[in-house]
C-alpha cells in the first residue's frame, strides 16, 4: 500500500470520527431541545399514552448509534423507553431461540436472521424456526470489514495482502471473531480468499479469538495482538485507523437485517421504531460512524 493510500485512509478515518461525534452530538442536542420544548404538552399526553419498554436485541457494533438514536426517539415519544441487549448476533439468535423476550432483532449478518425466519431457505433454517415476522423484515444497513493494527505498530501490516504474508510466516498474533459471530464469518471468508488454513494457524498459536466484535476491537486497541479484523464502525468508535478495507470479492457485502419478532410483547411499537430507523434523522447517526443505507 503506498503512502497516498495510507494518508487517504487516515483522512477518511479522521473524517469518520468527526462525523460520528457530530452526528451523536447533534442527535443528543436535538433530544435535549425536543425534551425541553415539549415538556408541558408531553406530560399531559404521556399520561394518556400507554408506557412501552421496547426490547431491542442488536449486534454489538450498533451499541453507540442505537443508544443515541434511542435517546432521540424517547425525546419525541416520551411514552417509549428502551432495553437494549447488545452482543454477537449468534448469541442473540440463541437467546431468542431459547425464549427470551424481544421486540426487535437487528443482526450483523443475514445468517442469524435467516435461522429464525421460516421463509428463509431450509439450507440455512435447518430447524424450521419461526420467530421472525417476515413482513417486517428489512435490510437496514451496510457496514464494511476493515483491517486494524495497534497505534504505532512496526510490523508493517498495512494491507490484507501484507496480513496474509505474515500469517503464512506465522510471525504475528492475529485476532478475529468466533465462528458464530458475523465478523468472524466474514474473516473466515477473507482467510479462504488467501487460501489460509484457519485451523492450522490457530493450532500454531497465530490466531486468537473474540466472542464479539467489541472484544476483537479491544484486543487491537490495547495492543494485545498485532492485527485484527473488525467493522469500520467499531474502528471509528474506538479511535482506530483502518489500514485496509475488504472488498466484496473477499467477504461479500456486510448487510444488517432487522425484523420484529412474531412473539414481540410490543409489536406495533417495534414496527414504528423500525420505520424510524430508516428515516433521514436516524440515518444521519448511522452514517456518522461509517454505516450506509442499503
What are these regions (language model features)?
Residues 102-107:
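Periplasmic-binding protein-like
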Residues 8-12, 76, 116:
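Generic low-polarity alpha-helical segments
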Residues 1-26:
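N-terminal secretory signal peptides
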Residues 3, 30-39, 43-76, 90, ...:
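Exported/periplasmic ABC-transporter solute-binding proteins
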Residues 77-82:
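A generic structural motif
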Residues 91, 127-133:
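N-terminal post-signal-peptidase region of extra-cytosolic proteins
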Amino acid at each position: 500500500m503506498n503512502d497516498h493510500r495510507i494518508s487517504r485512509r487516515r483522512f477518511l478515518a479522521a473524517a469518520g470520527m468527526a462525523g460520528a461525534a457530530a452526528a451523536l452530538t447533534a442527535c443528543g442536542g436535538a433530544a435535549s431541545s425536543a425534551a425541553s420544548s415539549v415538556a408541558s404538552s408531553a406530560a399531559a399526553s404521556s399520561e394518556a399514552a400507554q408506557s412501552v419498554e421496547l426490547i431491542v436485541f442488536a449486534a454489538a457494533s450498533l451499541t453507540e448509534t442505537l443508544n443515541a438514536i434511542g435517546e432521540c426517539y424517547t425525546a419525541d415519544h416520551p411514552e417509549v423507553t428502551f432495553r437494549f441487549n447488545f452482543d454477537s448476533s449468534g448469541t442473540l439468535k440463541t437467546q431468542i431461540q431459547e425464549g427470551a423476550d424481544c421486540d426487535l432483532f437487528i443482526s450483523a449478518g443475514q445468517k442469524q436472521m435467516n435461522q429464525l425466519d421460516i421463509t428463509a431457505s431450509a439450507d440455512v433454517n435447518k430447524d424450521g424456526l419461526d420467530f421472525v415476522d417476515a413482513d417486517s423484515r428489512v435490510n437496514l444497513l451496510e457496514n464494511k470489514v476493515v483491517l486494524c493494527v495497534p497505534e504505532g505498530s512496526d510490523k508493517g501490516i498495512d494491507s490484507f495482502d501484507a496480513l496474509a504474508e505474515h500469517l503464512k510466516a506465522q510471525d504475528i498474533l492475529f485476532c478475529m471473531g468466533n465462528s458464530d459471530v458475523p465478523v468472524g464469518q466474514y474473516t473466515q471468508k477473507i482467510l479462504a480468499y488467501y487460501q489460509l488454513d484457519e485451523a492450522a494457524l490457530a493450532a500454531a498459536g497465530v490466531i486468537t479469538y473474540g466472542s464479539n466484535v467489541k472484544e476483537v476491537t479491544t484486543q487491537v486497541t490495547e495492543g494485545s495482538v498485532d492485527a485484527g479484523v473488525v467493522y469500520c464502525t467499531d474502528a471509528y468508535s474506538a479511535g482506530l485507523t483502518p489500514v485496509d478495507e475488504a472488498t466484496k470479492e473477499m467477504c461479500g457485502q456486510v448487510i444488517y437485517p432487522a425484523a420484529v419478532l412474531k412473539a414481540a410483547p410490543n409489536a406495533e411499537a417495534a414496527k414504528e421504531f423500525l420505520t424510524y430507523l430508516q428515516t433521514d434523522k436516524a440515518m444521519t447517526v448511522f452514517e456518522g460512524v461509517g454505516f450506509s443505507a442499503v
